Swiss-Prot record:
It catalyses: L-methionyl-tRNA(fMet) + (6R)-10-formyltetrahydrofolate = N-formyl-L-methionyl-tRNA(fMet) + (6S)-5,6,7,8-tetrahydrofolate + H(+). Belongs to the Fmt family. GO terms for molecular function: methionyl-tRNA formyltransferase activity. One of its GO terms (cellular component) is cytosol. InterPro entries: Fmt, Formyl_trans_C, Formyl_trans_C_sf, Formyl_transf_N, Formyl_transf_N_sf, Formyl_transferase-like_C_sf, GART_AS, Met-tRNA-FMT_C. The keyword Chaperone does not apply. It comes from Staphylococcus aureus (strain bovine RF122 / ET3-1). The gene is fmt. This is Methionyl-tRNA formyltransferase. Pfam families: Formyl_trans_C, Formyl_trans_N. PANTHER family: METHIONYL-TRNA FORMYLTRANSFERASE (PTHR11138), METHIONYL-TRNA FORMYLTRANSFERASE, MITOCHONDRIAL (PTHR11138:SF5). Its EC number is 2.1.2.9. The keyword rRNA-binding does not apply. Keywords: Protein biosynthesis, Transferase. Attaches a formyl group to the free amino group of methionyl-tRNA(fMet). The formyl group appears to play a dual role in the initiator identity of N-formylmethionyl-tRNA by promoting its recognition by IF2 and preventing the misappropriation of this tRNA by the elongation apparatus.
Length: 311
């Protein structure tokens, strides 16, 4: 069986790892260190580590791979192939050169579009109607290696980061399973990326999460979809942060002051943007409160919201 080092961290990576364990010989798993999670800051292993532990696989968790003791240990292994999926670190050249068949990456976009750490988020934020999976050879430059295989998938109007993450995770494992035999047999072909067409999807920053209502409704709607259910777009109402998990677009008869609550219904808080498409907030969370449907919030506040300004 093909001896593989797998490198990945979040839930997206676990589907790929499970497939590799079933089909090949995974001799080591490399992932990020355990991190404190939640209000109580409980040290929690990354999802990939949990899968590796279930199968009693050796796990390496360097804070930074380059120059680490873990790297030296990995370089001693007899390995055929390195597979990465959302690992979160660049690989040093010494590790890229180690496996006989090279190092490949499962990336959640149609490269060269959306190189970087947040391709699913950015595709939705930008209003793309499709994205996909790319299997590519790894090089020193980020997400710039030759493309081995690609498969596209449609982004539906009601998709958000959560739903697309789950679809792409399955697609990534399936496409890798189809692609690996030709890589192992040495019969695959690969094509260089056109660097002139490259776009980038950097990790989401806190400032990217704040909603600017002085934009077209479609842009605000896509921002909400593209950040839900994590890290979640937010605005401010009465000096209190308000996270918005779900919304929809509604037509308005006139353009109102952006950010103004122009109407409430039984199920939504309708907020003006800078065009005639308003955003109807349906699922929300006020700072310090539990997440709730707008309908539940409105049962006690419907009559006092119209005219308020979100900033």
């Amino acid at each position: 069986m093909t001896k593989i080092i797998f490198m990945g961290t979040p839930d997206f990576s676990t589907t790929v790892l499970e497939m590799l364990i079933a089909e090949h010989d995974v001799i080591a798993v490399v992932t990020q260190p355990d991190r404190p999670v939640g209000r109580k800051r409980v040290m929690t292993p990354p999802p990939v580590k949990k899968v590796a532990m279930k199968y009693d696989l050796p796990v390496y968790q360097p804070e930074k791979l380059s120059g680490s003791e873990e790297l030296e240990q990995l370089l001693q292994l007899d390995v055929d192939l390195i597979v990465t999926a959302a690992f979160g670190q660049l690989l040093p050249e010494s590790l890229l050169a180690l496996p006989k068949l090279g190092a490949i990456n499962v990336h959640a976009s149609l490269l060269p579009k959306y190189r970087g750490g947040a391709p699913i988020h950015q595709a939705i934020i930008d209003g793309e109607q499709e994205t996909g999976i790319t299997i590519m050879y790894m090089v020193k430059k980020l997400d710039a290696g030759n493309i081995i295989s690609q498969q596209a998938i449609k982004i539906e109007e009601n998709d958000n980061v959560g739903t697309m993450h789950d679809k792409l995770s399955v697609l990534g494992a399936d496409l890798l399973k189809e692609t690996l035999p030709s890589i192992i047999e040495g019969t695959n072909e690969s094509v260089p990326q056109d660097d002139t067409q490259a776009t980038f999807a950097s990790n989401i920053r806190r400032e990217d999460e704040r909603i600017s209502w002085n934009k077209p409704g479609r842009q605000v709607f896509n921002q909400i979809r593209g950040l839900s259910p994590w890290p979640v777009a937010y605005t401010t109402m009465d000096d209190t942060n308000l996270k918005i998990y779900d919304a929809e677009l509604v037509e308005t008869n006139k353009i109102n002051e952006p950010g103004t609550i122009i109407e409430t219904t039984k199920k939504a808080i309708i907020v003006a943007t800078n065009d005639n498409e308003a955003v109807a907030i349906k699922d929300m969370q006020l700072a310090g409160k539990k997440r709730m449907l707008a309908a539940n919030y409105l049962s006690g506040a419907q009559n006092i919201l119209v005219g308020k300004k979100l900033i």
